[in-house]
Amino acid sequence: MAELLFLSSITHMKENSGGNEVDLFASFWKVEAEENGAEREFESMDKAMERLGMSRFRSRFSLNEKEKEYVRTKGMAVIKQHAAEIVRKRLAPAEIRNDGKQTPMRHGLHPVFIAQHATACCCRGCFEKWHGIPKGVRLSQSEQDYAVSLITEWIRRQTEENP
């Protein structure tokens, strides 16, 4: 119990290592800072969409008529809820058992899955490569919100540009 109290009262602990100070809790402080409101700078939606659109692979994705009708019927608020749930369950965890294979690519399941591939929010490898958010660490709420924004913006553009 005394050790627990001692550890919980530490605000910052450093170890002197060969004359260099090493922060023993560097990753903890980074996560804590993000959880306490230190926000990551995210790329604008327009810039992200433009960059993703330059990829031959990413730009080949589009919603079919049935998926567009599903979006129109459900409304963007519901689609955004679905996207948030899918991101929370399939993209946000630090370790994903089948990372790189967890997002279906075929049409007819859900428009969010197609949008995930188009926006590189389909797996942690693509998310890291395209958006610079490292895998191996649970996504913060702001990182999850960024992914959801990318997905819903792509879907919005698909349904408005190609009604």
Label each residue range with its predicted role:
Residues 50-103:
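The feature represents the first ordered module of a protein
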Residues 125-143:
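Iron-sulfur (Fe-S) cluster-binding segments and ferredoxin-like electron-carrier domains
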Residues 3, 81-89, 125-129, 153:
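Short, hydrophobic/amphipathic alpha-helical patches that form generic packing surfaces
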Residues 99-119:
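Immediate flanking context of iron-sulfur cluster ligation sites
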Residues 6-14, 19-63:
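N-terminal leader/targeting peptides and immediately adjacent processing regions
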Residues 146-163:
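Short Fe-S-cluster ligation motifs
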